[in-house]
């Protein structure tokens, strides 16, 4: 699974995920609604990739996620309150699922042109039928969606993005060690 993910990522983004490759090297930020995802690779990271063997980490890593909710008329106020008051420290590793497509990390905000993650947020965050609902539902989402965040070292910036086909904004997430 790790090899499949690495190959798919390299084919799509041109960089192999790995701490030695992506240290402060890639920034994902939202564009205007519907325009998708912007990527700014750092040239030093590309050179670093050529000079080092980038290895995935196999051990569990404590990944701290601070969540910035940008909701319009939230349907799940308990979950929003939980996110505001409880930054999540989640032990993660590579064996956890990445998202709706196995080559698509769930924290990539693709916009509806790319069709990557909008439905993931809509269904997981707001599906009150899920066991545990609210808080537990979001914990499960973050434990899966952030399963590879330790590879990126500050690569993900807070996002305030509202796709045209959604009635509320998705969550902006800042990830770091």
From Swiss-Prot:
Cellular component aspect of the GO annotation: chloroplast
Domain of life from the UniProt record: Eukaryota
Record keywords, A-Z: Chloroplast, Plastid
Location of the protein in the cell: Plastid, Chloroplast
Protein's recorded name: Uncharacterized 20.1 kDa protein in psaB-ycf62 intergenic region
Natural source organism: Chlorella vulgaris (Green alga)
Lineage of source species: Eukaryota, Viridiplantae, Chlorophyta, core chlorophytes, Trebouxiophyceae
């Amino acid at each position: 699974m790790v090899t499949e993910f690495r190959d798919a990522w390299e084919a799509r983004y041109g960089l192999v995920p790995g701490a030695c490759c992506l240290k402060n090297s890639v920034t994902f930020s939202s564009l205007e609604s519907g325009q998708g995802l912007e990527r700014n690779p750092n040239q030093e990271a590309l050179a670093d990739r050529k000079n080092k063997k980038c290895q995935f980490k196999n051990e569990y890593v404590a990944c701290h996620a601070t969540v910035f909710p940008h909701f319009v008329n939230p349907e799940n106020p308990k979950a929003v309150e939980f996110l505001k008051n409880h930054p999540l420290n989640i032990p993660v590793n590579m064996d956890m699922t990445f998202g709706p497509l196995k080559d698509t990390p769930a924290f990539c905000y693709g916009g509806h042109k790319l069709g990557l993650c909008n439905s993931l947020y809509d269904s997981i965050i707001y599906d009150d039928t899920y066991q545990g609902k609210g808080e537990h539902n979001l914990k499960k989402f973050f434990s899966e969606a952030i399963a590879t965040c330790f590879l990126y070292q500050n690569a993900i910036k807070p996002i305030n993005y509202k796709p045209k086909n959604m009635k509320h904004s998705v969550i902006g997430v800042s990830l770091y060690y």
